[in-house]
Amino acid sequence: MKLIMHGLYAICKLAMFSLQTSTAQSVQPDDLGFIIATPDDLFQGGARSETNYGDPSKPGLYVIRITFPPGAGSRPHYHSTARYITVIKGTWYTSWGPKADIYNPDDMLAVPEGTFIYQPPEGHHYDMAKDEEVIVQIMGMGPVITTQIPQPGQ
């Protein structure tokens, strides 16, 4: 297992240098510690997530797949740990960095099927499917905390 993890780490580090740039998401608790998250709080337009391995809220490796129907996407956010993403199906659209603090679907990079993306810890981003269903696979080390970036008027 250690050899596999070291190999995965080396591959991801190499890929990170060639391409840097989403997600079962969580919301933060209120002042009393309660969390109530509707699907619209987590994703816009009905994206759904399944956990294939591990648990993103617990220590250790996790693998999740997110299916974005056409028009579905996440709101601007960031994660506490790095994430390694492969676009399995469709063309995914993403925005990252300071410009990703404000949602603008007209200023996104088209990411074709088969693309690998490394998202560094606390890298601000958002993503979506535009005209077709998109499936992405996300790997990372838990526990991961997702923080939403407040939008103007919220």
For the regions a language model picked out, list residue spans one by one.
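Positively charged n-region of N-terminal signal peptides that target proteins for export
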Residues: M1-G7
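Bacterial N-terminal signal peptides
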Residues: G7-S18
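A short, N-terminal "cap"/entry segment at the start of jelly-roll beta-barrel domains
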Residues: S22-Y62, P105, Q151-Q154
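Conserved short histidine dyad/triad with adjacent acidic residue
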Residues: Y62-H79, V111, P120-P121
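Glycine- and acidic-residue-biased ligand/ion/polar-headgroup-sensing regions
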Residues: P69-P70, H79-D101
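Short beta-strand His + acidic residue motifs that chelate non-heme Fe in jelly-roll/DSBH
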Residues: S74-P76, T94-S95, Q119, H124-K130
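Short acidic-glycine-tyrosine-enriched beta hairpin
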Residues: A100-E122
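Double-stranded beta-helix
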Residues: D106, M128-Q154
